[in-house]
Amino acid sequence: MARRNLADAADGLKRRLREGDVLVKAVLEAEDDPLTLRRQIALKMILNAHSTGVMAAVGRVVGNTMTNVSPTNLKLIGRATYLIMTHVNDTLAQRDWVAAHGFADAVTFAEANAVLFDAMEYVRSHEMGQTAEVALSIIRMLEAFQRRAPASWDDARALLESDGLAGYLARHNPRLAT
């Protein structure tokens, strides 16, 4: 009975596919896997690959990082802080950046974290919904380094809305230009 319901579900899915859609079939044997760990790990890998593809398709990937992290818990705040620090420091170290704007000391984790918390408050107080705090923080920090003066959140937001993070970074970091 369960096998028939699965076949009916697969047929229904095939009827809903549109041109260009891809159906991925994974056969996961349950033999010698009493706790279904292999199946669960395989499913997790498939779902991770799918979500990575979706994030790339909607432009939420910069270089080899998914930058649209919603800092809602300690683990994600740490990841978001690391992404900010990494992208800012990578850009500050580029030869073209140094030639145009001069040398700057690398941003510390604590500095990136402080800017992230300011971004979280800015997004919350301006009811910006899905605005990415990571992208906003990266742009604000780089604009401040470029101007050698503080940059406002509104300026960073305008740049994010007009260029997106990938476009902004591509202009300032040739390694990320595609």
Predicted regions and their residues:
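Glycine-rich phosphate/diphosphate-binding loops and the adjacent beta-loop-alpha structural elements
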Residues: 30-37, 41, 52-177
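Glycine-rich phosphate-binding loops that contact phosphosugars or nucleotide phosphates
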Residues: 1-45, 51-58
